[in-house]
A protein has these predicted regions:
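Active-site-proximal loop and beta-strand segments within enzyme catalytic domains
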Residues: 1-61, 68, 75-78, 85, ...
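An acidic site on a long C-lobe helix of protein kinase domains
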Residues: 7, 63, 141-144
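Alpha-helix boundary/capping detector
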Residues: 40-41, 97, 112-114, 174, ...
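Short acidic alpha-helix initiation/capping motifs at coil-to-helix transition points
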Residues: 61-62, 241
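Catalytic loop of the DD-peptidase/beta-lactamase superfamily, centered on the K-T-G motif
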Residues: 72-85, 89, 123-389
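Short, surface-exposed acidic
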Residues: 95-97, 259
Length: 389
């Protein structure tokens, strides 16, 4: 997007999340999509930064993908093979895979769930994110990740064998992006190294990273001064438990007074969830068979967004009066549009994790010109504007 930044950007920048883009920007186009790694990297030129290069933090999965794609240029091995040969196999992580394809056929694999947008537990399909593999997309388990943590806590060694040079490991922990330098709670600063967050907590330096895919959120943390490593894997993505448990364990090991963090946070979480469900129920109550201001065929056709590509809107065959959106960059993603009133439609994805929202078509002189489309904040925060062809 910015030719000057293109000339200056380095691998270090891509691993530091300070290109100036927003957190998760572009992920609705890339996540669980049919885009190849090459196509994702090409489309990064359309990400308009809202922040300042090398100053503002914005988590960027496509940046990590790009950094990972440098590996085959240097080693001749794809990212997934190089990581397996250099890290997973030497650490004896026997139950860890670098590709997610085929997980649904595994006999002992956790299944993804969510309570988002419904207030009840729902089973989700597995994300297919091998196209974003270098952005931390591993299938693993607590026992295997414990070996990774032991390597981190022993300056790059595992069972006495050098896995990663200490100089390299130490460099990943050097703060590359300042997120905050002001006191907040029990922390005085927070920042990001190369693929790792860091902060102080009750006088100890803490390193951690969370992870997420639809139906899963994880938390891995280590405290070198205490020789402490923590990994938390959960298969329900709409909760704060995976964060609170980390602090509950940290507090216990640091011998801090006990505080029931769940008791403190849960009421506010439940109130927010109740408000969200009430809002969605209110939208659904407005579905009364009203007629939109233009004939249904006026809304059908192809719409385009420069970053995403094309969506196709058609009349839903089995539900007269409804419209169906096909997202052409995604394999199985669909959404229905049900007319409410006052030019407003209810948008509901067939994958519950993508969410439920309202939207309105843009028109000029009784001609449809476009439609804004929103997905869950878990994917991307901002809506996309699709222009009718």
């Amino acid at each position: 997007y910015d030719s000057a930044v293109t000339k200056m950007v380095t691998i270090h920048d891509m691993l530091s999340h300070h290109l100036g883009t927003k957190t998760f920007q572009g992920d609705f186009s890339f996540w669980d999509s049919k885009n190849s790694r090459h196509e994702i990297m090409y489309k990064m030129r359309y990400l308009k930064p809202s922040g300042t290069f090398r100053q503002d933090f914005g988590y960027c999965n496509s940046c990590f993908l790009t950094a990972g794609e440098i590996i085959p240029k240097v080693t001749g091995k794809p990212w997934e093979v190089y990581v397996y040969d250099s890290l997973i196999q030497p650490l004896g992580m026997e139950h860890t895979q670098t590709l997610g394809y085929g997980i649904s056929r595994m006999p002992n694999a956790a299944k993804p769930h969510t309570t988002a947008f419904a207030g009840k537990l729902q089973l989700l399909p597995y994300d297919q994110v091998d196209n974003l593999g270098p952005a931390g997309s591993l299938l693993s388990c607590v026992s295997d990740l414990s070996k990774w943590l032991m390597m981190q806590l022993d300056s790059g060694r595992y069972n006495g064998k050098r896995i990663v040079p200490w100089e390299v490991l130490r460099t990943t922990r050097d703060m590359a992006t300042i997120i905050s330098s002001r006191k907040r709670g029990d922390s005085h600063f927070s920042g990001y190294g190369l693929g790792i967050f860091e902060t102080d907590y009750h006088g100890k330096q803490i390193f951690w990273h969370t992870g997420g895919a639809f139906g899963f959120v994880t938390n891995t943390c280590f405290v070198p001064e205490e020789n402490l490593g923590i990994t938390i894997l959960t298969n329900q993505d709409n909760q704060d438990f995976f964060e609170l448990l980390r602090y509950q364990i940290l507090n216990a090991y640091l011998k801090l007074p006990f505080e029931n963090l769940s008791k403190t946070v849960l009421p506010g979480f439940l109130d927010e969830e109740t408000r969200e469900i009430k809002k969605i129920d209110g939208w659904k109550d407005r579905i009364k068979g009203n007629t939109p201001p233009l004939p249904l065929k006026s809304y059908t056709g192809q719409y385009e967004n420069t970053l995403y590509g094309t969506i196709t809107i058609s009349e839903e065959r089995n539900n007269p009066g409804n419209l169906l959106i096909k997202f052409n960059s995604h394999q199985n993603l669909l959404a229905t549009l049900q007319y409410l009133d006052n030019d407003e439609w209810l948008l509901t994805y067939n994958n519950p994790a993508f969410g439920v929202f309202t939207t309105s078509f843009l028109t000029k002189n009784n001609t449809v010109t476009g439609i804004p489309i929103k997905a869950s904040d878990f994917v991307e925060f901002d809506p996309y504007l699709f222009i009718k062809k």
